């Protein structure tokens, strides 16, 4: 600021008391992403006659703007529609932690039918854990997997049905 160099934040918002420290933010509306994913889940569940949703929520890194918005979108919908968030833990936006967390959740809750992962890496790990536990994913499977970011491998897993809904960050 003192040097007169404009700062533009990309992909993550910053929480500062002086908004004049940066000129602009370029990135996704993470709350809207969470709301859109929840709207999709509601419509899908209604169309398929799924009356009870027991959701395992694998959060991103706690405090990250993507985690805050995507979590808020899910929690608002869960309250509005009476969905059960049976487990909630950070996967730190990584595949390894996503797998570890999903393994733990599956051991503690045998009624999970949706996993809401706040990015694709977490979803990849969660899917590995689900399959290792002898359960299936996809539209005809035991557990529906929702994800965000649609990286190349995420798109491929959405096309195969392993990820049932993948929300793009743009």
Where are these regions (language model features)?
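A residue-level marker of the well-folded mature domains of exported/periplasmic proteins
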Residues: 1-170
């Amino acid at each position: 600021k003192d040097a007169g160099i404009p700062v533009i934040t990309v992909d993550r918002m910053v929480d500062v008391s002086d908004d004049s420290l940066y000129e602009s933010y370029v990135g996704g509306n993470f709350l809207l992403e969470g709301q859109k994913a929840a709207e999709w889940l509601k419509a899908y569940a209604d169309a398929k006659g799924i009356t009870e949703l027991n959701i395992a929520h694998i959060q991103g890194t706690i405090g990250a703007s993507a985690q805050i918005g995507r979590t808020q979108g899910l929690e608002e919908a869960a309250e509005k529609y009476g969905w059960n968030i049976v487990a909630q833990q950070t996967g730190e936006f990584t595949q390894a932690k996503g797998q570890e967390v999903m393994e733990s959740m599956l051991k503690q809750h045998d009624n999970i039918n949706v996993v809401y992962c706040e990015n694709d890496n977490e979803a990849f790990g969660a899917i590995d854990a689900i399959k290792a536990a002898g359960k299936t994913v996809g539209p005809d499977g035991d557990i529906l997997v929702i994800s965000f970011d649609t990286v190349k491998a995420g798109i491929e897993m959405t096309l195969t049905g392993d990820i049932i809904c993948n929300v793009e960050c743009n």
